[in-house]
Structures are given as structure tokens and as C-alpha cells.
Amino acid sequence: MARLRLLLRSARLLGLVALGLGLAAWVSLRERLPGADVTPLRQRLTRWWLARLCAALPFEVRVSGEAPRQPMLWVANHVSWTDIPLLGALAPLTFLSKAEVRAWPLAGWLAEKAGTLFIRRGSGDSRLINQRLAEQLHRGRNLLIFPEGTTTNGESLRTFHGRLMASALEAGVAVQPVAISYRRDGVPDAQAPFIGDDDLLSHLGRLLRGERGSVHIQLLEPIPSQGLDRAELARQAQQAVRLALFGTAAPTQTRRAA
């Protein structure tokens, strides 16, 4: 049964990848036209395609709360690469990703064509990065970041780093905290986390072979940035996500990922 699930789901996913490549190539051609601004088209197509990708993944998705109508800096806890399509299907988002993702076969190219902003961790040029992020927010675009800086197994929360929160302050926009929880058979999902030495294809294979899990996405109360510094903004966002996921007793990890 697991083998049949893998074959059927893989076939559906391959069809979606082919469709995504075709759409990305078409947008890339449109981009070359003189004076063409394809950003609105790219965001609409990206959201449409991500919604179909989510439907092909083995998750039952439940969403609490409403997506904001005005541009905000979305900050979420990070469990897996699947966080990105799940959130991207909810609203037009510009994604921020580590530079290594650009080198992933197919997925990296699709991410680039979807308008993802890539940053190199440890580059030290936080001012320039925040300027790029603030520009996106000034243009009325929602921006998604994962302030933990890495993925977790979903059973704890790492410290939210305030370095990238400065973009919300510079643009004068609120922060939209998001809590993502993966469950399977009533307990935290051990298959969903993309951590450690996982590679994309092996992780995807495990997901496609398994039974359907569940995902709960909570869009929490936005946090106004006015009057706060980036450290306090990060602390409040982290507290909101921690309370939504675990309640007051949940621990926060402070160690860096291995």
C-alpha cells in the first residue's frame, strides 16, 4: 500500500513540477519585455501553484485566523520546507531563503523564478539585507521570514533573532506571527520535520509513502512595530508563537543548530 501511495503521489507531484516549470519559463519570457513589471502576475501564479502543491502533499490543513489585508512582515516557526508552500497558498508572499536553496535541482530554480530573496548566512551585511527586505515591504508586498534561522522537530522553539526584524521597523509595518504545528495520530509528526542531514528527495519520499498527517496554521494577532526595537519585536513575536504552539510551559531552545 505504501508503494502504491508513493507511485500515485509521485506522479501527481511530477505533473505539478512540470506545470510549475512551464509557468516559470513563461513568466521569465514576459520579464524580458521592455518595461514589463511581472511581479503581480508572478505572485498570483505562485500562489495558485503553491495551493495545488499543498493539495498534493499528504496533509490535512486547518487554518485559524485571517490573513492581513495590508502588507506585513510574516514571521513563523520553521519545521520543514513544506512550511513555504503551506503559507504561500494563503496570501501573496515574497519568501526569504538561505542561499543554498538556489542550488537545489529544479526546486531552487522554481524558488528563484517565484521571486524568492536569497541570503547567505553569516555574510555579516545585515544592513544591506534589511534594506532589500524593507524595499519589498515599502512596495506593498508581504514578506515571510523564519527568525529561528533553522528548522526544528516541531516540539520546541528556538530563539527568534531580531536581526531581520529591522525591516519591519524601517518600513513601518506590523509583524504577522504565524504558528505551524504538524501532527500525526494525535502526537507531533516525526515525518514532517526537515532537519539534520535530511535531503529533499529522501524527505519527500518518506512523506509520500506515509499516511496523511495534519497541519494547523495559526495566523495570530499582528504586532505593531511602532515604538519597539528589533529585539523587543522579536521577543513579542516569539512569545506569541510559543503560546500558540505549547502554552506558557513550553521551553525555548537557545542552542544553535548542529
Curated annotation (Swiss-Prot):
This is Lyso-ornithine lipid O-acyltransferase. It comes from Pseudomonas aeruginosa (strain ATCC 15692 / DSM 22644 / CIP 104116 / JCM 14847 / LMG 12228 / 1C / PRS 101 / PAO1). SUPFAM superfamilies: Glycerol-3-phosphate (1)-acyltransferase. One of its GO terms (cellular component) is membrane. Pathway: Lipid metabolism. It comes from the Bacteria. Induction: Induced under phosphate limiting conditions. The keyword Cell membrane does not apply.
